């Protein structure tokens, strides 16, 4: 960070940044034109593979006979190749991320801050996956605190913003597990954890409008990139303070009362005699977890509002299982209807329109003769998630769909929310699938148990909250309002 500050000082970034801001205004029309062109290319790609309006989310009529189509500079590949491509070492996962997220630019490097960071974040996710029973109580505690403070006990209908509520709830839950009790309720830290992701996304989008050869210079002056570096500096103050306080208290990873990634990662780093950037690691964890899980929660709550007949059966399942098995991870696994609802919501509205982004390291010929050129970026389409030849009545939300599949021996191995298959790639597919999906599932289930038992809720305006596409992403309208009121609980937590 001192190096970056020195560079900015030597280059006189303050006035140059102002100049770039003015210049940005003069070329605004060009950037908007490129964005519209990119959107048009995306819609053309979907039009080539589908017999429906690309702006619609009803993809039940997706064609089955397409193989590849262009998506900007990348090649969109049919799901038929998912199993073949998923673990092919000739297709680089790392380079795909670098191209999509510009991970080598200062201020953007939190996604990959060196090989140790790559491994340690993966290890952290795997660590939590093996100790999920220890996170249920902390997650429940934070959910109770958040809902009490932000949703309240009012038994009359009142409104809260759907997406913002889910985002900040998940931000607090993940902060409890990633950085600990010291900061998980701190508004400034939660602002950093949520804001950095969106600011980073905007900076990448802005940088990608420039010639790649200019990016190593341009990023020093663009206000969006400077803002990210300032955010990292601010985050560093929070993280360094917590680490210093813990060292003074001689807190170790063996402290059974502490369950958070920072404590555990510090321990691993000491064991491996490695140094690492704790701040960038925390931002990377937040980048990977907060908005993705918040988006998932937004969509499943909206789906329940649109399918209210699912709410009472879910409440009965939750009450029955917790009453018999207690409030622990094993009980959450027995909630097969809740699990099915989560998986169905993700099938109907996954995070985006493609997954498995890769860069070819050499010319590749797939089994059917399809050619992939060296250096070409390929992405697997998610259109199969809405294909009626795979999913009966694919356009319809069926909360019982995956619960029914559990009784079918041919389908039972891939029905849980966290399971992976070529036909449902909500968490990716292959060895690079989301390592944090087990933790995300526990977070979502804990939060939903509290929401369902403590509150009645409904969308204020179903039309205004409809799902929509923005570029390659599938969103719920962030302006949607949720009407809520406190209800009488029928269980003791």
From Swiss-Prot:
User: Is-annotated flag, keyword Transmembrane helix?
Assistant: yes
Give the EC number(s) listed in the UniProt record.
1.-.-.-
Q: Which residues does the record give as heme binding sites? A: 434
Keywords carried by this UniProt record:
Heme, Iron, Membrane, Metal-binding, Monooxygenase, Oxidoreductase, Transmembrane, Transmembrane helix
GO biological process annotations for this chain's record? mycotoxin biosynthetic process
Q: Which family does it belong to?
A: Belongs to the cytochrome P450 family.
In its UniProt entry, what is this protein called? Cytochrome P450 monooxygenase esdpG
Source lineage: Eukaryota, Fungi, Dikarya, Ascomycota, Pezizomycotina
Q: Which gene encodes it?
A: esdpG
């Amino acid at each position: 960070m001192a190096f970056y500050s020195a560079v900015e000082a030597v280059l006189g970034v303050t006035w140059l940044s102002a100049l770039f801001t003015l210049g940005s205004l003069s070329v605004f029309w060009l950037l908007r034109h490129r964005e519209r062109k990119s959107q048009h290319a995306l819609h053309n790609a979907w039009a080539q593979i589908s017999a429906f309006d690309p702006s619609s989310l009803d993809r039940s009529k997706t064609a089955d006979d397409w193989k590849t189509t262009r998506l900007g500079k990348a090649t969109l590949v049919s799901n038929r190749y998912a199993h073949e491509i998923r673990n092919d070492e000739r297709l680089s996962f790392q380079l795909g991320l670098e191209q999509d997220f510009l991970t080598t630019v200062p201020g953007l490097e939190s996604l990959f801050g060196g090989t140790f960071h790559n491994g340690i974040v993966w290890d952290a996710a795997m660590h939590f996956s093996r100790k999920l029973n220890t996170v249920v109580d902390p997650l429940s505690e934070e959910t109770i605190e958040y809902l009490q403070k932000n949703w309240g006990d009012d038994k009359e209908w009142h409104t809260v913003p759907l997406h913002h509520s889910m985002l900040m709830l998940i931000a607090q839950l993940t902060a409890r597990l990633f950085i600990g009790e010291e900061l998980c309720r701190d508004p400034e830290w939660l602002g950093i954890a949520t804001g950095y992701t969106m600011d980073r996304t905007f900076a990448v989008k802005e940088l990608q409008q420039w010639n790649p050869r200019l990016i190593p210079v341009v990023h020093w002056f663009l206000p969006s990139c400077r803002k990210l570096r300032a955010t990292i500096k601010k985050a560093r103050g929070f993280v360094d303070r917590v680490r210093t306080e813990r060292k003074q208290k001689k807190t170790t990873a063996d402290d059974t009362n502490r369950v958070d990634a920072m404590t555990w990662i510090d321990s691993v780093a000491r064991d491996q005699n490695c140094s690492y950037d704790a701040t960038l690691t925390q931002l990377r964890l937040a980048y990977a977890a907060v908005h993705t899980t918040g988006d998932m929660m937004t969509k499943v709550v909206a789906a329940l509002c649109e399918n209210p007949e699912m709410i009472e059966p879910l409440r009965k399942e939750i009450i029955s299982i917790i009453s018999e098995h207690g409030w622990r991870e094993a009980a959450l696994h027995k909630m097969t209807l809740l699990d099915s609802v989560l998986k169905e919501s993700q099938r109907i509205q996954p995070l985006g329109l493609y997954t498995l982004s890769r860069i070819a390291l050499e010319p590749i010929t797939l089994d059917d003769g399809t050619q992939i050129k060296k250096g070409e970026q390929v992405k697997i389409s998610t259109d199969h998630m809405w294909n009626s030849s795979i999913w009966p009545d694919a356009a319809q939300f069926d909360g019982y769909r995956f619960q029914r599949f559990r009784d079918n021996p041919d389908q039972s191995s891939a029905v849980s929310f966290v399971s992976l298959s070529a036909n449902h790639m909500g968490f990716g597919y292959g060895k690079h699938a989301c390592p944090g999906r087990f933790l995300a599932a526990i977070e979502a289930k804990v939060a939903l148990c509290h929401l369902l038992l403590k509150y009645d809720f409904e969308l204020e305006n179903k039309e205004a909250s409809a799902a929509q596409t923005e570029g390659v992403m599938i969103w719920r309208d962030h302006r949607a309002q949720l009407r809520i009121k406190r209800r009488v609980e029928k269980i003791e937590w």
